[in-house]
Amino acid sequence: MALVLFSRNFIKHPRMLGSLIPSSRFLVNRLLDQVDWGRAGTIVEYGPGVGTFTGEILRRLPPEGNLVAIDTNRDFARYLTRTLRDDRLHVIEGSAADAGESLQERGLGRADYVISGIPYSTMAPELRAQILHTTHDLLQPDGAFLVYQFTRAVLPHLRQVFPHVQQEFEPRN
């Protein structure tokens, strides 16, 4: 069901999704291994889709933690709400550009981590800049923005907003 929903939405909205199929477990593990789960109180996920990362984040997240999953796609938001029943999960149908407000509305303060797979290279430059600046502002001072992409196009934009940017490659994705 998840793969069908994901693929159908890729066909309907190819610029909103970075790939025809969800991320591999290799990418999920590689990215999430960078999280210090002992200090992961609040995590924000942009573009959770069918929950490939979301489910694994919840599996690793401490009992007192919170995960705010933000997706512009109504089908994905509804799917996550139906399939991932967890009190720590807050599914929002909306824009990553409004993530700061979403955290404030839930009394969650700043995020320890923001995880994002939304395709920055296909979005309007103004929206991309707004999302990156919003993300910078909502992170704890020692927080991290973990981005996975299929191209390097977002790197110069990340470097304009974030002081320390590093990249890695996962060949098995």
Predicted regions located by residue number:
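Class I S-adenosyl-L-methionine
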Residues: V154-N173
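Class I SAM-dependent methyltransferase Rossmann-like catalytic core
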Residues: L3-G38
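A short glycine-rich, Lys/Arg-flanked "PGG" loop and its adjoining helix->strand segment in the class I
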Residues: A129-P141
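Conserved SAM-binding motif I beta-strand of class I
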Residues: N66-D71
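S-adenosyl-L-methionine
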Residues: A77-E105
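Conserved class I S-adenosyl-L-methionine
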Residues: A40-G49
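Conserved SAM-binding loop of SAM-dependent methyltransferases across substrates and taxa
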Residues: V50-P62
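Conserved beta-strand signature within the Rossmann-like core of class I S-adenosyl-L-methionine
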Residues: D142-Q149
